[in-house]
Amino acid sequence: MNRRIIFISALFISLFVSTNVWGQTFDPWVYENPERVIYAIEKSWSKTPLKVGNDFPKAMIRNFAKSFCSQYQKYAPNVAMTLYLKKPGQNKVEDDNYYMEDDPRNGYIKCNMPGQFDYLTEMCYWKRANGHSLVGVLLQMGHEGEGVDDDSALLFYDFDPSTRTMTPDMKVYQTVKDILAKHVGTPTFNLPKEGKDIRVHYIEFIQTDENDFKWEQNTLKWENDTFTEIEGETGLY
């Protein structure tokens, strides 16, 4: 049985189980090839400002997540997070297929769908000097056991509380893209659960007698309303 068939079968099972958790009927074929969905979102997101509701007055990260995830419903973690946010105090945060991290106090939320095709939606936000917020959205998919074969999109929005609108922040987005372009390795990210900085893990395939991959762990430091890269550890494995 090839990998494509295995993936579709596993995804069908996971979505069926999730139907029992969140009371929603899924069409598993919609979520085929999630890496293509990530690519499609990154190609189009800059054209679409998002209105933000106020369903959670004391948990802005939930409002941001609901706004973004409801806009992009062809990506399974977004669907799961949208359904979770209908009743976040009552819905399960974990089953065999989805794991939610919901931390309103620290302004952080994540929905992860583990397995061979481990993929997630992760969000947080930073306060800006002008009273706005910078909202970070990470869509990431990693093929377990396949080294550098990862797909991700790291997007940024400026939230204006006076208009309750999330506008794509292309300046910050391009700053981060320019930093990443200096590296050969494939990046994966961890948005901050606490603190302000983003962790970036680069993995580069190399051909040697003893090692196949080179890794580099750096930090995108948030200060003065922008990100700068701080170099960290490197190694081989």
Model region roles, listed by residue range:
Residues 132-141, 194-200:
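Acidic/hydrophobic-patterned starts of short beta strands in beta-sheet-rich repeat architectures
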Residues 23-127:
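Terminal domain-start segments
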Residues 165-237:
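Short aromatic loop motif centered on NTY/YTY
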